[in-house]
């Protein structure tokens, strides 16, 4: 009987509602931890792994030797490579695709590459308008690498002690 009376007074005085309002009021004046993303940005780590890029040697020749280690080590199976032999007997890629919907940005491809061909850049913000645009092909990867080569080389040199 006492339980029913207590419950009646609690519901009559709306104690649960007042408790919720007090909690809201208490957190209203505390500092906010939310970052308003497009206007404010988090500081990026020097080892941040973002959009991929293929690098070239200083003479302009692409670094990838089509060893397919990155394709083999990729846990998400996001990398597809086709290769062909050239006239001089070396192998080069004819197709190098990365499906960014599958990629988990683990960095294994970058670690396994013996010639530092595939790297992950600092680029975080990219979008796709259509479904097929999520597959980044070899010319696109080379263009990203050409555009950011100075920055990539600088970041690799700064991180060389930890590799």
UniProtKB/Swiss-Prot annotation:
Membrane topology type: Peripheral membrane protein
One Pfam family, short name: Fer4_7
GO molecular function: 4 iron, 4 sulfur cluster binding; iron ion binding; NADH:ubiquinone reductase (non-electrogenic) activity; quinone binding
Ranges in coiled-coil conformation: none
Binding site for [4Fe-4S] cluster 2: 74, 103, 106, 109
Keywords: 4Fe-4S, Cell inner membrane, Cell membrane, Iron, Iron-sulfur, Membrane, Metal-binding, NAD, Quinone, Repeat, Translocase, Ubiquinone
Protein localization: Cell inner membrane
Superkingdom of this protein's organism: Bacteria
Chemical reaction(s) catalysed: a quinone + NADH + 5 H(+)(in) = a quinol + NAD(+) + 4 H(+)(out)
Note accompanying the cofactor annotation: Binds 2 [4Fe-4S] clusters per subunit.
Reported cofactor(s): [4Fe-4S] cluster
EC number per UniProt: 7.1.1.-
GO annotation (BP), single: aerobic respiration
First-level EC class: translocase
One GO cellular component term: respiratory chain complex I
Primary site of residence: membrane
Subunit structure: NDH-1 is composed of 14 different subunits. Subunits NuoA, H, J, K, L, M, N constitute the membrane sector of the complex.
NCBIfam families given in the database record: NuoI, PRK05888.1-4, PRK05888.1-5
Main function: NDH-1 shuttles electrons from NADH, via FMN and iron-sulfur (Fe-S) centers, to quinones in the respiratory chain. The immediate electron acceptor for the enzyme in this species is believed to be ubiquinone. Couples the redox reaction to proton translocation (for every two electrons transferred, four hydrogen ions are translocated across the cytoplasmic membrane), and thus conserves the redox energy in a proton gradient.
Similarity-based family: Belongs to the complex I 23 kDa subunit family.
Protein name: NADH-quinone oxidoreductase subunit I
High-level lineage: Bacteria, Pseudomonadati, Pseudomonadota, Gammaproteobacteria, Lysobacterales
Originating gene: nuoI
